[in-house]
A protein has these predicted regions:
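Short glycine-centered, acidic/aromatic-flanked micro-motifs in structured strand/loop junctions
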Residues: 22-24, 59, 75, 109
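Generic hydrophobic, helix-prone segments enriched in Leu/Val/Ile
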Residues: 16-19, 29, 79, 98
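N-terminal hydrophobic or amphipathic helices/low-complexity stretches enriched
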Residues: 1-22
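Alpha-helix capping and helix-loop boundary segments enriched in small/acidic/polar residues
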Residues: 3-7, 24-27, 110-114
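Predominant activation on well-ordered alpha-helical scaffold segments within soluble catalytic domains
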Residues: 13, 17, 37, 120-128
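Active-site metal-coordination/substrate-binding segment of hydrolases
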Residues: 65-135
């Protein structure tokens, strides 16, 4: 069972949970960058990954939107890594231990990395969704 499976919107929190499984502290973004590249490849999207592990994924426009202005969804992949005193967690190797309490998502004993982790999750969910017309 996924920790966030009852959170809405489901696809956003599916991707957020996937992101949280991957170590992605500042300066340690190769794995999360490669995850995004794998996502692009799986969906047949063009992409660019640079030497700093930045990734741009291109999704073709929906029929009828080919000449509409381009839309960019942007977020950063890294997180600030902090933990409570006494918590054993290696941010270089370990994903986050998530929980949901009283409707709030948290990471047990560590920072959540939700500030732009959720932005990346929303972008992936939108890229994955074929039902939303887009430029």
């Amino acid at each position: 069972m996924r920790v966030l499976e009852n959170c809405e919107p489901k696809r956003v929190f599916y991707y957020f949970e996937e992101i949280c499984k991957i170590p992605h502290g500042s300066g340690n973004t190769k794995q999360i960058s490669d995850y995004l590249v794998d996502f692009a490849k799986k969906h047949g999207f063009d992409y660019v990954q640079d030497e700093m592990n930045n990734v741009v994924i291109y999704k073709p426009a929906s029929k009828g939107y080919e000449n509409a202005p381009t839309v960019i969804l942007q977020g950063h992949m890294d997180m600030v890594c902090e933990k409570r005193p006494g918590v054993e967690h290696d941010f270089e190797k370990d994903g986050l231990n998530l929980s949901v309490r009283d409707g709030y998502i948290s990471a047990n004993g560590t920072t959540l990395g939700g500030d732009d982790g959720i932005a990346v999750a929303y972008a992936l969910a939108l890229l994955d969704d074929e039902s939303i017309p887009h430029p």
